[in-house]
């Protein structure tokens, strides 16, 4: 009987250890190139190696992703800072874990595409012409920051609300809108199909997208956060060491159009870091000005308490 009891205790201890080593994370993503390190981490078993059972939940739209996060169906989230602050302000218990993409010269993530009829116009020519985007979102924030960077007054463009990006691209290519704010690789696709590129956000020197985790992963000495960061770092390093190895994965998971599959670059993803207090304040100041926030969210509420 004593041996049986010892065996049961050992079995329970082993089960508890296995449970502790395999932390479940349901992570909401969009099929965009910012999320490639997450895809590498899952494909190569890096999250599993660090004791995380990572499930990437793909959403067709940011609205669907945000709804799932609000409903408590997700443990983590990929998104932009504007959407992130809106969710945290609405009571979603999550924190910014790391910056997934910063604007990087030579690697545009967003830009203003020109319709075929306007492809040869410059910034001065575009004054008062339509710019398709999603208002009250990171797209409008980027448009404002790009106007500042390019030395024109805010309101240089006539903003036209076109929420769905595929429709925005279609209207651009059929000359129903003069220009459109598009993410890559659609910015390159528009140029390939006869449009132009007026400007990109690559030199704005700002965080564009972030990864967030539920508050629970920052408890108990932030063990869950540490495991997540360790796996993510390995994924970023593998992409840096052998980018071409992951071209097919990028094409499959990040919606790279067939005409661009062989030549679209594998981007140099940044090692985990947090946005600065000044960068976060700049985003929130804009959100308050636009009426998206009444008061700013404290960094102590929104940001990881630990530097990755």
Q: What positions do the PLM features span?
A:
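Short, glycine-/small- and polar/acidic-enriched structural segments
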Residues: 21-150, 159, 178-184, 198, ...
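Bacterial N-terminal signal peptides
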Residues: 7-15
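Pocket-lining segment of extracytoplasmic ligand-binding domains
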Residues: 82, 156-160, 164-249
């Amino acid at each position: 009987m004593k041996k049986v009891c010892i065996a049961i205790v050992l079995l329970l201890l082993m089960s508890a250890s296995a449970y502790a080593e395999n932390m479940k994370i349901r992570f909401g993503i969009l099929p965009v190139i910012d999320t490639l390190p997450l895809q590498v981490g899952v494909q190569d078993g890096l999250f599993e190696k660090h004791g995380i059972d990572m499930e990437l939940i793909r959403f067709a739209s940011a609205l669907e992703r945000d709804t799932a996060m609000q409903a408590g169906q997700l443990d983590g989230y990929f998104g932009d800072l504007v959407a992130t602050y809106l969710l945290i302000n609405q009571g979603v218990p999550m924190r910014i874990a790391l910056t997934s993409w910063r604007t990087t010269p030579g690697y545009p993530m967003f830009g203003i595409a020109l319709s075929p009829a306007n492809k040869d116009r410059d910034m001065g020519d575009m004054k008062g012409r339509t710019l398709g985007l999603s208002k009250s979102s990171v797209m409008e924030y980027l448009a404002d920051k790009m106007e500042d960077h390019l030395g024109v007054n805010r309101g240089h463009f006539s903003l036209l609300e076109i929420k769905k990006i595929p429709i925005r691209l279609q209207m651009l290519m059929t000359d129903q809108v003069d220009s459109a704010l598009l993410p890559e690789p659609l910015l390159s696709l528009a140029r390939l199909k006869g449009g132009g590129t007026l400007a990109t956000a690559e030199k704005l020197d700002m965080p564009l997208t972030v990864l967030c985790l539920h508050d629970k992963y920052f408890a108990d000495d932030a063990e869950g956060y540490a495991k997540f960061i360790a796996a993510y770092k390995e994924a970023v390093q593998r992409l840096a060491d052998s980018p071409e190895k992951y071209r097919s994965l990028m094409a499959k998971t990040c919606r790279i159009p067939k005409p661009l599959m062989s030549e679209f670059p594998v981007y140099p993803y940044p090692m985990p870091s947090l946005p600065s207090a000044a960068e976060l304040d700049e985003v929130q100041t804009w959100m308050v000005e636009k009426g998206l926030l009444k008061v700013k969210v404290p960094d102590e509420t929104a940001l990881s308490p630990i530097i990755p």
